[in-house]
Curated annotation (Swiss-Prot):
High-level lineage: Bacteria, Pseudomonadati, Pseudomonadota, Gammaproteobacteria, Legionellales
Disulfide bonds: none
UniProt family annotation: Belongs to the complex I 49 kDa subunit family.
Family matches, as PROSITE patterns: COMPLEX1_49K
Entries under Pfam families matching the protein: Complex1_49kDa
PANTHER family, sorted: NADH DEHYDROGENASE [UBIQUINONE] IRON-SULFUR PROTEIN 2, MITOCHONDRIAL, NADH-UBIQUINONE OXIDOREDUCTASE 49 KDA SUBUNIT
Name of the protein described by the UniProt record: NADH-quinone oxidoreductase subunit D
Length: 417
């Protein structure tokens, strides 16, 4: 009698569909997954511990590198935690700028997710189209911070600087003729807000393009419909947030339920799924692209009409302007103390969370009155989502496991921390 045994397969961490450094130990019966055991920790960098050894302002850059696709949203949760402990409120213009860039970040995240998921499932064209739009938004990051990804733009009490009046332009070179340069610089003649407004006018057509390629595509639907179904009850029990929770039919969004920044001043809808499968999660994220575009347009309209300060006028928390610092001794001392020692927070604890593109990104901060946190705990949405992978994937084929993993939108920078 031949003894039949289940087959054990290692998936990742080098696999291109592993979304970073995920290692899955899969138990297979033929091609059907019987059990999945995710192994994490291969990107652990001790971010929480590092933040506990540095002044508050020096850890903003660490936040960018957690979920390195949702940079400014991570910063937002961190600086909001500091602001709550300090008891300060950023100016309204800073709140609108934060809201606008949170939505720019959401579009950046969802475009990468859409392109990578399509590529995993076998559709390459969408991947190229998504990266075409991402480049324009990275130009906005670069215009305000000088960096295309890890911006470190948000600050306790506001943002680092106001929006620029000019956009970087392409210069003539031997690789591009004048006609090409003129075409590339067509939308770069005005300010950042003008550039972003032009983007929001053409972006809905781009989303229609993606949907034309995927939404009614027979192969796409065969790979995603009724795959990885999660009921609303299970979604809550697993601790789902963001598109994973809304895809299962629960309209929970921190931007509406626990409003922060300027989200209570803008209009948008919360897309919700019905079935809780990979296809619903896809539709939710595509609709979020449209809603983010809508929010950005409202922010641009307000910012154009309302100039003003972008950070609190308190030299204990925010550095003085360089013009003042170079002529005033007191301002110079404040500047020096702020960047060498930082500032002290009153004793206490606080939890601050934002609706990041992947779900609820939270910062739990404990202060003992020093210039650095006594304890910093990061609540990453992807950790809860990956925990449910075994439950979601059981009984599915091996190829479906790739689609389910892609629908979770996993990034290991935040999971391993």
């Amino acid at each position: 009698m031949i003894e039949l045994k289940n087959y054990t397969l290692n998936f990742g961490p080098q696999h291109p569909a592993a979304h970073g450094v995920l290692r899955l130990v899969l138990e297979l019966e033929g091609e059907t997954i019987v059990r999945a055991d995710p192994h994490i920790g291969l990107l652990h960098r001790a971010t929480e511990k590092l933040a506990e050894t540095k002044p508050y302002i020096q850890s903003i850059g660490y936040m960018d590198r957690l979920d390195y696709v949702s940079m400014m949203c991570n910063e937002h949760a961190y600086v909001m935690a500091i602001e709550k402990l300090l008891g300060i409120e950023p100016p309204l213009r800073a709140k609108y700028i934060r809201t606008m860039f949170d939505e720019v970040t959401r579009i950046l995240n969802h475009l990468l997710w859409l392109g990578a998921t399509a590529l995993d499932i076998g559709a390459m064209t969408v991947f190229l189209y998504c990266f075409r739009e991402r480049e324009d938004l990275f130009d906005c990051y670069e215009a305000v911070s000088g960096a295309r990804m890890h911006a470190t733009y948000y600050r306790p009490g506001g943002v680092a600087r106001d929006l620029p009046d000019t956009m970087p332009q392409y210069k003539p070179s031997r690789w591009h003729n004048e006609r090409e340069i003129e075409k590339k610089n067509h939308n770069r003649q005005g300010s950042l807000l003008d550039f972003l407004w032009a983007f929001t006018e053409r972006f809905p057509r781009c989303v229609d393009e993606y949907e034309t390629l995927l939404t009614d595509n027979r192969i796409w639907k065969q790979r995603t419909v009724d795959i990885g179904i999660v009921s609303p009850e299970n979604a809550l029990q697993w601790g789902f947030t963001g598109p994973m929770l809304r895809g299962s039919g629960i309209a929970w969004d921190l931007r509406k339920k626990q409003s922060y920044a300027a989200y209570d001043r803008v209009d948008f809808d919360i897309p919700v799924g019905k079935t809780g499968d990979c296809y619903d999660r896809y539709l939710v994220r595509v609709e979020e692209l449209r809603q983010s575009n809508r929010i950005i347009r409202q922010c641009i309209e307000w910012l154009r009409k309302h100039p003003g300060p972008v950070k609190v006028d308190d030299y204990k928390v925010t550095p003085p302007r360089r013009v003042v610092m170079k002529h005033d001794m007191e301002a110079l001392i404040h500047h020096f103390k702020l960047f060498t020692e930082g500032f002290c927070l009153p004793r206490g604890e606080v939890y601050s969370s934002v609706e990041a593109p992947k779900g609820e990104f939270g910062i739990y901060m404990v202060s003992d009155g020093a210039n650095k946190p006594y304890r910093l705990k990061i609540r990453a949405p992807g950790f809860a989502h990956l925990s449910s992978f075994d439950d979601m994937v059981r009984g599915h084929m091996l190829a479906d496991g790739v689609a389910i993993l892609a629908s979770q939108d996993i990034v290991f920078g935040e999971i391993d921390r």
